[in-house]
Each structure stands twice: as C-alpha cells, then as structure tokens.
Amino acid sequence: MRKVAVVIGSQTDLPQCKEGLTLLQNAVESGQIQLYLDSVFISSIHRATDDTLNQLADISKSEDVDILITGAGWANHLTGVCDAYLRYGLDDVRTRVIGVAFEDKDDQTHTQAAVASIVNVPGTQVIYQDDGGIFIGADGFTRACQFAISDELPAIKLPEARPQVRMSLADAIAKGG
C-alpha cells in the first residue's frame, strides 16, 4: 500500500488544500493509501528550518513513505529544499516529491514566483505537473493528491552531485571574467 506524507508551508495555505486533503482522507478510509503518522505537517522552511529538516529526516528514516506532497506559496522554497535535502542530504532515492504552488489571488507575482521556484530548479526530481498542467492552487493540490493516490510513480534519476568549492577572493574575481 502506498504511503503518503504531506508538508504545507503555512496554515494560510490550508483553504487551498481542503478538497485535496478530503480526497486523501477518503483514500485512507477506503484502504488505498496510508497517511504518514495520520498527519499533515505545517512547517515553514524559512521560519522553522530545523523543524522542517528534522521532519524530512524522520520521513526518510521511516523507509516506507513513497511520496511527499509539498505545497507553499510566494517563492515556495519548501519544495526545492525538501527534494534537495532528501536526495543529497539524506541519500533518499525512494521518496518522490510532488510540488504544488499555492496561489496568491491578491498578487499574481507571488503565484508566478511559487511556480518558477518549482519548475526552474536544475536537476530537480520534483513532480510538478500531470496531464492537466502544473500543480497550482486548490485545483493543483487536488490533482497532486490524486496523482499521489493512483498514478504510476516515476523512478528517481539523480544528477551527479556538485561538490562545494572554496577559492580565494582573488581567484573568484579572476574566474568571474
């Protein structure tokens, strides 16, 4: 049975999650999936960084979470950090990450930034769309939940990690052109 975890960046995003969370609840009740710790985690990568990373470590250590649904608005760093930390920090090549960009109806530049922060990450393994398009807003979250319940999960293909490079200030200036 597939096991799903959910991490949302803010409680203010929950109204966009209601239909999708209801879909997950129905799937749990019908025995289609299990929800990790029977919980939805609300955790800001900016304001609760350690808590978020510790939760990801717990999810990874459980060794039975197949898919992590992440959702956040504005710049949505949550999704990319979850994917990068699982892959390169925890060496987790089992848990797939679905990213949802939540809408800001008052300022579409926030919505656009949330989308760009998911789809424009080089080497990302984040699942951010289905046949209906990119996972954006309430409809996108619902479709992401449906994908987590019933779609075939893609294999994770990691690009080669890039080691940190340390150089002198003079060398950095020289390499800068």
Language-model regions: role of each:
Residues 18, 53-57, 142:
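Amphipathic, non-transmembrane alpha-helical secondary structure
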Residues 11, 15, 90-92, 96-177:
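C-terminal binding/interaction regions
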Residues 1-46:
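Glycine-rich phosphate/diphosphate-binding loop of Rossmann-like nucleotide-binding domains
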Residues 20-26, 56-57, 84-87, 115-117:
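Short, solvent-exposed amphipathic alpha-helical segments in soluble enzyme
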Residues 52-101:
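Glycine-rich phosphate-binding loop
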Residues 13-18, 49-52, 74-82, 107-111:
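Short glycine/serine/threonine-rich phosphate/pyrophosphate-binding segments
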